[in-house]
């Protein structure tokens, strides 16, 4: 059945209902009404009822979690919509923001801060004007249509989440077949780098999926650097993986092959495509022990 309407609660908006409605708005392009659902809404599979109504029934497109018991898994409305789209497991694996969003909505800020191993004050400091403005503008509306700027932004957010998750698996398979691992000798432990060759197949976003790939391969503790095509120029980007302090690319900023090296040392852009030269640049970027 074709979806005709999205209904979510009135009043203050939270990240989970905003993102859940963003996904549904992108997928279906239908109006969003902020009000209590009727019994007819809950019984109508053409109406998505989000974060309100006291019912979770994917067949009827009811996506509320507030009726779940205190010891239930920390699923929010966003989780339930992602499950319905078949994207939840990949989102958990590759969207590091999802689990904290679930915790925040179901457990509250104090417990979320504990689980994230940060202070309550630090959690609050992570709020940005983007969060506050979008949630405030969304919460102030009674109905949103395709001509609403807020609705249009929501569709962009939903589109980016869906496209990221649906294309990531394809990119991971590509990386599995095409990456190389380099070992760069140093005075101490060698540096391990992941190298991805230039190709038209990845020209639009060459570095997409590399971090996720390293994690899925279980190589987080082995890789120190990444070498990948530079989408802004005809060369390569060199960057630290997980901000590995064994590399400082500002050390190579004066090299003739280097177009740009960040003063903080975490990334450089180079013109050479020669693999021998690329390995030499990595070696030159290795931080030597003082003395």
What residue spans do the PLM features occupy?
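Short, extreme N-terminal leader segments that mark the start of a protein/domain
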Residues: 1-31
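Short, well-ordered loop/turn elements at secondary-structure boundaries
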Residues: 2, 43-44, 57
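Generic beta-sheet signal
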Residues: 4-6, 46-49
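C-terminal accessory domains and tails appended to enzymatic cores
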Residues: 11, 15-22, 37, 43-46, ...
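Short, low-complexity, polar/charged sequence segments that are solvent-exposed and flexible
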Residues: 25-27, 66-69, 80-82, 255-259
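A short, well-structured beta->alpha microelement
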Residues: 28-42
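A basic- and aromatic-enriched beta-loop-alpha substructure that forms the phosphate/nucleotide-
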Residues: 47-132
